[in-house]
Structures are given as C-alpha cells and as structure tokens.
Amino acid sequence: MLKIYLLLSAVITLLLDIPFEIFKQTYSWWLVPVLLIGAFVALVLLHCIVLLVSVLVVNLDKPPKDTDFFRLLVKTFLKMALPILRVKVHTTGLEKIPEDEPFLIVSNHTHNLDPAIIYYAVPDARIAFIAKKEVRDLYPFVYKALHKLNGLPIDRENNREAAKVIINATKLIKEKTNSVAVFPEGYVSKTGELLPIRSGSLKIATKAKAKIVVCTTWGTKQVPKNLFRRRTDIYFDVLDVIDTAENQQTVELGEKIGEIMLESLITKEGYPTKTQEESIDFQ
C-alpha cells in the first residue's frame, strides 16, 4: 500500500504539471520534491482518517464484518506507525507458519503492544485475537478494531464465558474463517518473566485439530520508555509448530509450550536472570 501511495504521489505531481507547467519553472528543483512529499503525506492522512472512521462506526452489538479492505488498512497503518515510533521488528522462523490452513498462534505476553507486533509480523494470516474483556473500557478504540477483526473478548475469571470463547474460536478455525491468537499465560507479565501456561486455551487447537504455532515476543515493554528518544528493537520469533493430531492432552501441550518459550526467552537481553526452570510450573 505504501508503494501505491508513493506511485500515486508521483502521478499527482505529474498531473499538476499539466496546467501549471511546474517542470518548466526555475524553482522546480525544490517545488517538485515538496509536491511529492505533500501528496504522500496527504494520502497517508487520508488513510488514517478512513481507518479512524471505519473503527468508529463499528457496532459492537452486531456480528463483525471481517473484510480484506479493513485488514489492509490496519496492516498499512502499522507499517507506517511503527517506524515513526522508532520501533524495529526483527523476525525469525516465519517460514514455519502453515500457509494453507488456519492455526492457533500462542505467545508470551509482556505488554499491550504484543498483539500489534504479532499482526505486523504475520501479515498474511487472517488472525483473530482473544483479548481480555477489560480492553473494552481501557482501550475502546482498540476494542472496536479487534471486534471488526473477529476478535473474541474473554472474561478470565468466568469459566462458563471462557468456555464459550473457546467454542467460538474453535469454530473460526474449523470453518477456515480465521487463525486465532491467544496469550496462554492469561495475563501481562509485569516483570517480563514467563508466567505459568494456562492449558485451557489450547483446547481451541485440539478441538479444531489445528496446529499450534509457538512464538515469543520480546522488547515491547521498552517502547514507552524509548518513545521517540531511541530505537526499540522488538524480537518476534516463531519457535515451533506443534501438530495436535499427535498430542491431544492440553496439560502436556502446555508444559511443552512453556518449555519451548522459556528456552528462547532466557537468551534475550534483559530477561530476568533467576533460575526460571526452578521457579515456573507450567501445569
């Protein structure tokens, strides 16, 4: 989309030359770049306005309408916003992600920016996020955007409601509507340390007979501290893909996923240094 905006900026500049003969003017050496930049900025602002309006008109009482156009708006916005925030996302293992089937993607959770990073890093997957219901009150704009992307709010303390979310998420995968992303720790880790894995969310994959894409996200906690002052390096690593057809026991899956995540996280700069193997129970 950004390349299209650059091309359109050039086209607009060329069209302006027809009535005003800009290229024949002595001051064209500085006016042409100004027009190119101005046209590009105008298109970017228009993009943001369209995205803003698209989210504001979302009716939370109606089923979401997950469209390719809206997903393109969001993905392009993230491509523009992250560099402005001086965020550099480093990715590894993306080639492991299944291309022809929906899946359950699981990651550790250290900051509220984690969903945006996952969405940015895995642009080709139609991901629906499971998010805590408190997002509706804390970040209403984000909540509306997640709703439009088939997101599922979950009450972590209400087992009956959580079971409904698992059923709906399973349906999204079974019907090949969306892949689903969940943070199986259940909460944002305030210290960055990996919290015990709640295996209940893994029923989404076992019931849908879907693969589990195990990932880690590291560095998002530093974004607010570094904002505009220095670059923040964020690392999104796809570690493994687990076929649930070979393992239907969610407790065992949770233990395995926790071990895989921990093995990666302890190599990251800034990860808590105490002996994690002795302090974390993944059951």
Per-region residue spans from a language model:
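Non-catalytic C-terminal accessory region of glycerolipid acyltransferases
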Residues: 6-9, 163-283
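A generic local structural motif
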Residues: 76-77, 89-93, 115-116, 166-169, ...
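Short acidic-hydrophobic, aromatic-tinged amphipathic segments that line or gate anion-handling sites
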Residues: 91, 152-155, 244
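Catalytic core of membrane glycerolipid acyltransferases/transacylases, capturing the structured
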Residues: 55-74, 83, 98-158
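Generic preference for hydrophobic
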Residues: 91, 105, 129-130, 236-238
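Membrane-anchoring hydrophobic helices of lipid-metabolizing enzymes
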Residues: 1-20, 24-102
